[in-house]
Design a protein with these regions (language model features):
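N-terminal Sec-pathway targeting helices
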Residues: 1-15
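Extracytoplasmic soluble-region selector
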Residues: 2-5, 19-137
Length: 137
């Protein structure tokens, strides 16, 4: 009889430990990922997973946003002597493109696309997974 009780006790302990492990793994705290992407005359830093500091070289250029998606938005634009800095915030998960226009001193313009892929974690946290910044062709 004691062997049977011991076996039942071991099975119950295994089940309890398994359920506890499942609960703990599902309720892990979200840890945002930050990263930096550098390109020719630009740099983007993902901060706390859901916002970007985009720095664009200002040498004889003026930068402006001409189109924004629904998934992210720029809330401020700072201009220093050599850098235009845009602060971009993720609003929703999905993919989107923001179009920037560069106006040079001679009046010519070139457009660039900032493309983001944003995912959602634990229903409330947004994470920027990838970004690219390239000239429109």
């Amino acid at each position: 009889m004691k062997k049977k009780q011991f076996t039942i006790l071991v099975l119950v302990l295994i089940i309890v430990v398994g359920i506890a492990a499942l609960i703990l793994s599902r309720n892990r705290p979200y840890k945002p990922t930050s990263f930096v992407v550098d390109g020719d005359n630009w740099s983007a830093t993902v901060v706390d997973g859901s916002s970007i500091l985009l720095e664009l070289n200002n040498n004889s250029k003026e930068w402006s946003i001409i189109s924004e998606p629904e998934t992210f938005v720029s809330d401020f634009h700072t201009i220093t002597e050599n850098i235009s800095e845009f602060h971009i915030i993720a609003l929703n998960d999905g993919e989107g493109e923001m179009v920037f226009q560069c106006t040079k001193d001679d009046g010519s313009t070139v457009q660039y696309i900032l493309a983001l892929s944003i995912s959602r974690h634990q229903k409330i946290h947004l994470q920027i997974d990838s970004l690219s910044f390239k000239e429109c062709t």
